[in-house]
Amino acid sequence: MGIPLGEQFTPGHPVVKRTAIGQKFVGAVVNIERRNRTKRGDDGVSVPLVRSDGKPRQELIVTCLVMPGTDAPAGIGDEQGIPETGDTVRLILKGKSFADWIQAEKALGRQLQVGDCVKQRTNSAQVYDADGNPKGQPLTTNEEVEAVPRSQTVGIYAELKLEPGTGEWIDKAEAAYRAATAVPLTASAPQQQVEADEEPW
């Protein structure tokens, strides 16, 4: 039986990076979580980011198991490397990437489940000015990206696709989901609560 996604899930695993055009990530989805975006100010305090209508800007955190075919780096901070097959990593999607995920979910044709496969391949980049507005045309080669002065901000974007999970990767992703969301039980826990916790599995 497939496990529907939507519960809160916040492990601190390495984040998949987009550092060059042509990088591929393939993963089995373990869980997803929406959260409000924040930005650290000059005083070191994080403040919420809001849209023009006053609503909070959001991002999507997708926890995955790395599948074969991945060559995109992952890491936390400056420590990055190509993850091994089976490693747990996170995709952090915001802005256009978040919108692309929503479209990919619609194209999947059903509710996303643990073990479904996400495929991401970086295919373009965009230079932004100091105010965060796009500057010039999208870039499509790494040579163009490398020629951009370091003083300018470059965002690298990817095409994203969701596919139904298959075989052992569903089993592995479901095991990871259960391990991460397990609720410790004590001797004083009410019997009805124990039954409710076990019911979905």
List the model feature ranges, each with a label:
Residues M1-E84:
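OB-fold ssDNA-binding interfaces and closely related basic DNA-contact patches used
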Residues M1-F9, K161-W201:
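Acidic, gly/ser/pro-rich intrinsically disordered tails
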Residues G27-I32, L60-V66, V89-L93, L112-Q120:
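Hydrophobic beta-strand residues in large extracellular and virion-surface proteins
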Residues D87-Q103:
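Short, structured beta-strand/loop micro-motifs enriched in basic residues and often containing a Trp
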Residues L91, S151, Q192-V194:
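Positively charged, low-complexity intrinsically disordered regions
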Residues F98-R121:
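Short nucleic-acid-contacting surface segments enriched for D/E, G, S/T with interspersed K/R
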Residues K119-A182:
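OB-fold/S1-family single-stranded nucleic acid-binding modules
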